[in-house]
Regions:
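Short glycine/serine/threonine-rich phosphate/pyrophosphate-binding segments
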Residues: 1, 84-92
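Surface-exposed amphipathic alpha-helices with a cationic face
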Residues: 2-9, 96
Length: 122
């Protein structure tokens, strides 16, 4: 997705999201597993489908912020998503504040909440 966007507009910035205190993308030793609550990201490796050369920056998000945003998406917008989606939206809000008025920020919501129904998440 990042390559496609940059081919269409070289000014596009690709921002990765990682759990707070851990980021293989920021140079933490790959394979080091840190316990966090944001399922689906920060698993201690860089996936083969990811080209780190396309990433312009990394925003880290705490467990609490990811869970808060996930719950807010559910309660205010009816979006039943998981914590990686909550982390992405939280990071998008941080980026939007950094870039200021008139900027455009897009993100993806990569998961759904059905696997979390038996947890305290929702």
């Amino acid at each position: 997705m990042g390559r496609y966007l940059k081919e269409r507009n070289p000014a596009v910035q690709i921002i990765a999201v990682e759990p707070d205190g851990f980021s293989a993308l920021l140079g933490l030793e790959p394979g080091l597993h840190v316990i966090h609550q944001i399922q689906g990201i920060g698993d201690g490796f860089i996936p083969s489908v990811l080209d780190p050369g396309l990433i312009d920056d990394v925003i880290t998000v705490s467990d609490d912020d990811a869970v808060y945003c996930t719950r807010k998406l559910s309660r205010t917008l009816g979006l039943l998503v998981g914590t990686s989606a909550g982390a992405n939206v939280y990071a998008a809000r941080i980026l939007s504040a950094r870039l200021g008025p008139g900027s455009r920020v897009a993100t993806v919501l990569p998961d759904r909440a059905e696997r979390y129904f038996s947890t305290a998440l929702l």
